[in-house]
Amino acid sequence: MIVLEVRNLAGGEVLHACPQNASDRPLPCIVFYHGFTSSKLVYSYFAVALAEAGFRVIMPDAPEHGARYFGDEKGRMQRFWPILLQNFAEFTALRAAIAGRGWIADDRLAVAGASMGGMTALGIMTHHPQLKSVACLMGSGYFSSLAQSLFLHPPWTRSS
């Protein structure tokens, strides 16, 4: 059995999952990021599986996604890279809030994600050497080359 709940952490809504009866006990902790145009709820099956394995999982919504989505789909498609960079910037406060609650056992904090979330995990890794582990599923660390092709020209502006 697990606990799966929405909490406010570091000024934002996160999905929090952990084994039952361990809500306030230190555990190995994973911050998991979702993919572009998705949300923490769509990726919640990762939180469930990891909590069942004994981890604490924190899943934030990226800017303009999930609970933070404000309805501008066309605009969001133009802002992939700023959203990714904001994920990086927000991690420091999120990590501090998780640590401040005493939720991390023995400094065992990892970051993971899928697609844009995997790219987020890789970017965070470059500035947080204290992380114990990083997992990138279906993402890429080739930011410089991707910036030349990924979301450079949105599909609705291209001619056939």
Enumerate the language-model features and the residues they cover.
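Primarily recognizes the serine-hydrolase "nucleophile elbow" in alpha/beta-hydrolase
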Residues: 94-154
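The serine-hydrolase catalytic nucleophile loop
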Residues: 36-48
